[in-house]
Amino acid sequence: MASFFSTLRRSLNRLLIALPVLLGLMISTPAQAAQWDAETLTVPADGDGALVTFSEQEIKTGRKVFNVSCGTCHAGGITKTNQNVGLDTETLALATPARDNVASLVDYLQDPTSYDGEYSIADLHPSMRSRDLYPAMRDLTDEDLRLMSGYILVAPKVLGVDWGGGKIYF
């Protein structure tokens, strides 16, 4: 019995020595968020294949602008009014004209058209053309549109199917 208490005492002493060291390391080491790599932040700039690399700060700003201006109907990259048409990469690429690059998304935000590109939906969808009808669009600049477009294109790389998954995922 004495050897049991002796072993227990030695184990507790070791733990009491190691515990403050471990706590000190946990407290003194700041948490670091994972850094996004350049590949994740690089998206098509236009339909000709040019690429643009956004900074993390630009994507964060684009996310904030998107959430305030578009997030009510497009939270998580879905379209609440038509869950068959989301903001996922495949759906954007299949639109006419394709909306899978920054320039074409900015063009859409300025003057939106139907998914098949046949007619304008500016009276039904918030845009710069119809900013008098949609207050969330009134104060947006061209830079805001560019940053939102960057966020829309980077989000599927970061979130995967959680971005724009549509009705099959929700």
Curated annotation (Swiss-Prot):
Entry membrane topology: Peripheral membrane protein
Gene Ontology annotations of biological process type: photosynthesis, light reaction; respiratory electron transport chain
InterPro entries from the UniProt entry: Cyt_c-like_dom (IPR009056), Cyt_c-like_dom_sf (IPR036909), Cytochrom_C550 (IPR029490), PsbV_cyt_c550 (IPR017851), PsbV_cyt_c550-like (IPR016003)
UniProt cofactor(s): heme c
UniProtKB keywords: Electron transport, Heme, Iron, Membrane, Metal-binding, Photosynthesis, Photosystem II, Signal, Thylakoid, Transport
A cellular-component GO term for this protein: photosystem II
Residue numbers binding heme c: 70, 73-74, 125
Function: One of the extrinsic, lumenal subunits of photosystem II (PSII). PSII is a light-driven water plastoquinone oxidoreductase, using light energy to abstract electrons from H(2)O, generating a proton gradient subsequently used for ATP formation. The extrinsic proteins stabilize the structure of photosystem II oxygen-evolving complex (OEC), the ion environment of oxygen evolution and protect the OEC against heat-induced inactivation. Low-potential cytochrome c that plays a role in the OEC of PSII.
Family: Belongs to the cytochrome c family. PsbV subfamily.
Assembly: PSII is composed of 1 copy each of membrane proteins PsbA, PsbB, PsbC, PsbD, PsbE, PsbF, PsbH, PsbI, PsbJ, PsbK, PsbL, PsbM, PsbT, PsbX, PsbY, PsbZ, Psb30/Ycf12, peripheral proteins PsbO, CyanoQ (PsbQ), PsbU, PsbV and a large number of cofactors. It forms dimeric complexes.
Name under which the protein is recorded: Photosystem II extrinsic protein V
Species for this entry: Synechococcus sp. (strain CC9311)
Gene: psbV
